[in-house]
């Protein structure tokens, strides 16, 4: 689509008829552009929020192909090469994300997968429990096995260095500390790994969801920092959820779950997360970096 738009813009805003188009040919190009824009719109509209990261990755790949076609149209080799690189890397990223979210590339292309399904009548909504930093410190001080589950909120708050400091304090206190990283946590595969590596978190502490899930029932405290959909237990238990079938980090199996969030908002999929109202879950509202830094200060003061 972007390539066709480039051709149209080039033909109308340079010389009178640079490509030798007759009026009917120009109308044909305009009609094709309108059809392709409509096709792109109707392809994306049915997609559920839980599958949107895969769609965005796929559209990134298509944008690279569009740039490559535009390069062919204007005989620009640099644009062709860069467009092909973007298209190829975007396609590889799409395949990785499809696998991580338990989707197939065929369903991505030919089905409106992930559409919202109607849910049955629900009971009265439970309110999540909240806790102060001081009370959270008392629980962490007694914990011997702690797992961090980072998400996009950690990236937004730039809390990775504060998380490393808290990790060090917990280890000094005798706790075993690990990180359970979902493959699509953040905005691309490896996003959390890069941030934690920047903060000098040891590589051996960075575990995949598949590695940590069998051990989650033995974890004293799971600290969810800015993650939402990737810890939503509905992906396992609720067939009516648009997230159903997506692998998650089983944070809900830990003895205690701390969820660090700014507010009660939903994740990228737009669906509610029952983890937040579980009996073993407490919310610690506020900026993730400030909250983690406050926990570090509690350890330092005590």
Predicted stretch roles:
Residues 124-302:
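Structured cytosolic domains appended to multi-pass membrane proteins
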Residues 30-32, 74-89:
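Loop-to-transmembrane alpha-helix initiation sites
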Residues 46-65, 76-77, 85, 105:
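Short, non-helical or kinked segments that cap or interrupt transmembrane helices
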Residues 85-143:
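Membrane-interfacial segments at transmembrane helix termini in multi-pass membrane proteins
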Residues 39-52, 94-98:
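C-terminal ends of transmembrane helices
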């Amino acid at each position: 689509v972007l390539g066709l738009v480039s051709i149209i813009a080039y033909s109308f805003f340079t010389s009178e008829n640079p490509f030798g188009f007759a009026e009917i040919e120009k109308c044909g190009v305009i009609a094709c552009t309108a059809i392709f824009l409509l096709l792109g719109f109707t392809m994306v509209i049915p997609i559920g929020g839980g599958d949107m990261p895969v769609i965005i990755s796929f559209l990134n790949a298509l944008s690279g192909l569009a740039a490559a076609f535009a390069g062919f149209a204007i005989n620009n080799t640099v644009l062709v090469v860069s467009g092909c690189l973007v298209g190829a890397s975007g396609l590889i990223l799409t395949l990785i994300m499809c696998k991580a979210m338990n989707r197939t590339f065929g369903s991505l292309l030919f089905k409106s997968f992930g559409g919202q399904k109607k849910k049955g009548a629900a009971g009265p909504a439970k309110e999540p429990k909240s806790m102060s930093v001081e009370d959270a410190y008392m629980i962490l001080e007694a914990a011997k096995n702690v797992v961090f589950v980072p998400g996009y909120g950690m990236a937004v708050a730039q809390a990775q260095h504060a998380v490393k400091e808290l990790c060090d304090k917990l280890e000094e206190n005798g706790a075993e500390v690990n990180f359970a990283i979902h493959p699509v946590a953040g905005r691309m595969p490896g996003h959390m790994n890069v941030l934690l590596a920047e903060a000098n978190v040891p590589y051996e502490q960075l575990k995949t969801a598949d590695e940590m899930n069998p051990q989650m029932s033995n974890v004293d405290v799971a600290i969810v920092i800015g993650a939402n959909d990737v810890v939503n237990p509905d992906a396992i238990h609720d067939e009516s959820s648009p997230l159903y079938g997506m692998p998650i980090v089983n944070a809900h199996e830990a003895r205690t779950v701390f969820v660090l969030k700014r507010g009660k908002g939903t994740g990228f999929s737009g669906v509610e997360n029952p983890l937040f109202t579980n009996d073993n879950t407490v919310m610690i509202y506020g900026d993730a970096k400030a909250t983690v830094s406050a926990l570090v200060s509690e350890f330092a003061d005590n």
